[in-house]
């Protein structure tokens, strides 16, 4: 059944909500919706106390390791961690308390999918795919086609998000995380076509993020996906300075499902 899933987005060691398509290394180009006065552990405890499992902690660029570790200490085994995950550090993050690790960019050296990199990450996790989430965050290319975007969503890769690519990757992971980068942080609604396609293509859990504004969007995702796709709401949440919906309303929505 569709659930609300929260997030902790870390940028320069702080919890922020950003406009996804503007995220490159030049801070002058970065459009930020919100910078939290609270440390990451505050949000980890908030999610833990409200039984919001499956939340993702994303390290957007360098300088976020300590902040991510702080989150994991607040809720060991309760959070997924992504951003800069490779075969060299995947196991280290699980040992530090991550429920699962999330990989994107490492799978696409020079923007091209690498099966050997995927195999290496899984091997580092002793072949335990229950510990692995593949992030197929994407940008729309033309009508109803989406391609995986990496390097903070600035580089379009050679992988189209399609039934074929989903089926090829499912044997290696326990779930997918998909940010619609063109919608991320804009609070202008979800990519309904993408949500619908994901429910048709995926046979394992999948979380969609990007443009979610309120409980109506949760209901829309539930309807479009037949309850198969979860939704992350970020910038619209009251705890991130948003006016669209409160965290408590989302918690209560989950309990009603």
UniProtKB/Swiss-Prot annotation:
Pfam families: His_biosynth. The lineage of its organism: Eukaryota, Fungi, Dikarya, Ascomycota, Pezizomycotina. It is an enzyme of class 5 (isomerase). It comes from Neurospora crassa (strain ATCC 24698 / 74-OR23-1A / CBS 708.71 / DSM 1257 / FGSC 987). This is 1-(5-phosphoribosyl)-5-[(5-phosphoribosylamino)methylideneamino] imidazole-4-carboxamide isomerase. One of its GO terms (biological process) is L-histidine biosynthetic process. NCBIfam families: hisA_euk (TIGR02129). It comes from the Eukaryota. The keyword Amino-acid biosynthesis applies. It is found in: Cytoplasm. GO terms for cellular component: cytoplasm.
């Amino acid at each position: 059944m569709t659930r609300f899933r929260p997030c902790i987005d870390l940028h320069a060691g702080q919890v922020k909500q950003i406009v996804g398509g503007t995220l490159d290394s030049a801070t002058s180009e970065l459009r930020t919706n919100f910078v939290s006065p609270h440390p990451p552990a505050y949000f980890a405890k908030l999610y833990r106390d409200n039984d919001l499992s499956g939340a993702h902690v994303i390290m957007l660029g360098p300088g976020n390791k300590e902040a991510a570790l702080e989150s994991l200490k607040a809720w060991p085994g309760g959070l997924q961690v992504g951003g800069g995950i490779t075969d060299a550090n995947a196991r280290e993050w699980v040992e530090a308390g991550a429920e699962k690790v999330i990989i994107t960019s490492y799978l696409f050296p020079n923007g091209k999918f690498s099966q050997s990199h995927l195999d290496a990450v899984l091997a580092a996790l002793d072949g335990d795919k229950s510990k692995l989430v593949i992030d197929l965050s994407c940008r729309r290319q033309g009508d109803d086609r989406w391609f995986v975007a990496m390097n903070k969503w600035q580089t379009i890769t050679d992988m189209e998000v399609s039934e074929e690519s989903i089926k090829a990757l499912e044997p290696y992971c326990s779930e997918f995380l998909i940010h619609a980068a063109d919608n991320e942080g804009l609070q202008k609604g979800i990519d309904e076509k993408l949500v619908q396609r994901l429910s048709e293509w995926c046979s394992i859990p999948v979380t969609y993020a990007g443009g979610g504004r309120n409980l109506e969007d949760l209901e829309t995702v539930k309807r479009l996906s037949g309850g198969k796709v979860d939704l992350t709401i970020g910038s619209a949440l009251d705890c991130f300075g948003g006016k669209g919906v409160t965290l408590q309303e989302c918690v209560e929505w989950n309990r009603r499902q």
